[in-house]
């Protein structure tokens, strides 16, 4: 069974260590999620324009109500303008 859903997504860019021990790379196609296992691939789609990106979970968060994903700056920019800050997305856990 494929896990899918909708939620808010934002982006972050600090150059800290991620929860799995990697140095955060704002240009990598990665994301933070509260519970998905590290290295899980997730397809994230912006329903407003149909653009999608596949990211790898390597961090924990976001810690803002209503949001389930924090995308790297590069991943967010692939599906929406950075000026928006956060958007509603559809997601599909690929494994």
Where are these regions (language model features)?
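Secreted/periplasmic proteins
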Residues: 1-95
């Amino acid at each position: 069974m494929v896990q899918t859903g909708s939620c808010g997504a934002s982006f972050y860019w600090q150059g800290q260590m991620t929860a799995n021990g990697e140095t955060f790379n704002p240009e990598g196609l990665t994301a933070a999620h509260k519970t998905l296992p590290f290295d899980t691939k997730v397809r994230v789609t912006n329903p407003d324009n149909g653009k999608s990106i596949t990211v790898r979970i390597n961090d924990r968060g976001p810690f803002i109500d209503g949001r389930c994903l924090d995308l790297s700056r590069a991943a967010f920019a692939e599906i929406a303008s950075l000026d928006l800050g956060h958007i509603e997305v559809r997601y599909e856990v690929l494994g």
